[in-house]
From Swiss-Prot:
It is found in: Nucleus; Cytoplasm. It comes from the Eukaryota. Expressed in the pars intercerebralis and fan-shaped body, regions known to be involved in sleep. This is Bifunctional peptidase and (3S)-lysyl hydroxylase JMJD7. GO terms for molecular function: 2-oxoglutarate-dependent dioxygenase activity; endopeptidase activity; ferrous iron binding; identical protein binding; peptidyl-lysine 3-dioxygenase activity. It comes from Drosophila melanogaster (Fruit fly). The modification Cysteine sulfenic acid (-SOH) is found at residue 19.
């Protein structure tokens, strides 16, 4: 065992003993800003707040209501053959990191497509503050003051407020984000698999050529490689393992990961701290809204960057 591997091993052991439990903490009430900051934000620990939201959106945002109120509204939609927007797929023996086919559609048409289990998978998941940009009328059904505990702790407004709508085939493959994520489920449920940042060395990652889904004249999906202005292939680092069915023979390091699993129901809030790996699946026609807050680039970020370099040095 190298000195780097020994140091990473110490980190895994001590973090397991001191920091992370075997399940995500659950609360039955919204915490004060002080409680949230002290117990979760400052410790980079996730928490689920059960039945926290008494918003008009809960119960109101049905597919029928969305069609009647905003059915003619044009929205960005991600389309894939398998439900994995921003994920790995293979074509002609080559594995790619693949972006979805993105297009504009009427909201009513998206909802209709969700009831076709044999067709392509349509998912409203544009992470550009699409609720504010495409569906601003829906903001009136959110009582964002319920999230003051988070905003006061982060001491900043959200960078983006995103609207999510898809069927049970839509999956978000495992990844991490440089954001504090306050995730609110409006209808249905979301299933999260979470891995803390200190387990970075347990999560296998690879560098993959980047592609995007396209459709042929016959409607068949294919992957078109992305290239830069000089014609060179583009590449993306991405998590190699599927946490729902990990190939431990191929990725033995993942055996040391200790994923946390949690189901977030309608009316629940999940606080997902920055740089936590997460994989997300969902129920049919699940609707959610999440609030992204940029992370503070403080000493914790510096330590995480050091961990990235140590993990790379071990692999290299």
């Amino acid at each position: 065992m190298s000195e780097v591997e020994r140091a990473l091993d110490v980190l895994l052991q001590e973090a397991e003993e001191l920091c992370i439990g075997s399940s995500v903490v659950e609360l039955d009430r919204i915490p004060t800003a002080l409680e949230f900051c002290r117990e979760f934000y400052s410790k980079n620990q996730p928490v689920v707040i059960r039945k926290a939201l008494n918003w008009p959106a809960i119960g109101k945002w049905t597919p029928k209501y969305l069609i009647e109120a905003l059915g003619d509204r044009s929205v960005d939609v991600a389309i894939t053959p398998n439900g994995y927007a921003d994920g790995l797929a293979t074509q002609n023996g080559q594995e790619y990191f693949v972006l979805p086919l993105e297009t504009k559609m009427k909201l009513s048409e998206v909802v209709r497509r969700l009831d076709d289990p044999t067709g392509a998978v349509h998912y409203i998941q544009k992470q550009n503050s699409n609720l504010s940009v495409d569906l601003p009328e829906l903001a009136a059904d959110l009582r964002v003051s319920d999230l003051d505990f988070a905003q006061q702790s982060f001491n900043k407004p959200p960078d983006a407020v995103n609207f999510w709508l898809g069927d049970e085939r839509a999956v978000t493959s495992m990844h991490k984000d440089p954001y504090e994520n306050v995730y609110c489920v409006i209808s249905g449920h979301k299933d999260f698999v979470l891995i803390p940042p200190h387990q970075l060395s347990c999560v296998p990652r690879g560098i993959y050529p980047t592609g995007v889904y396209k459709t042929s004249d016959s409607g068949q999906f294919y992957i078109e490689p992305l290239r830069d202005e000089e014609g060179s292939d583009q590449f993306t680092e991405w998590v190699s393992v599927d946490p729902l069915s990990p190939d431990l023979a191929k990725y033995p390091e993942y055996a040391r990961a200790k994923p946390l699993k949690v189901r977030v129901h309608a009316g629940d809030i999940l606080y997902l701290p920055n740089y936590w790996f997460h994989h997300v699946s969902q129920s049919h026609k699940c609707i959610a809204v999440n609030f992204w807050y940029d992370l503070d680039y403080d000493s914790r970020y510096c330590y995480y960057r050091m961990l990235e370099q140590m993990t790379s040095a071990r692999s290299g």
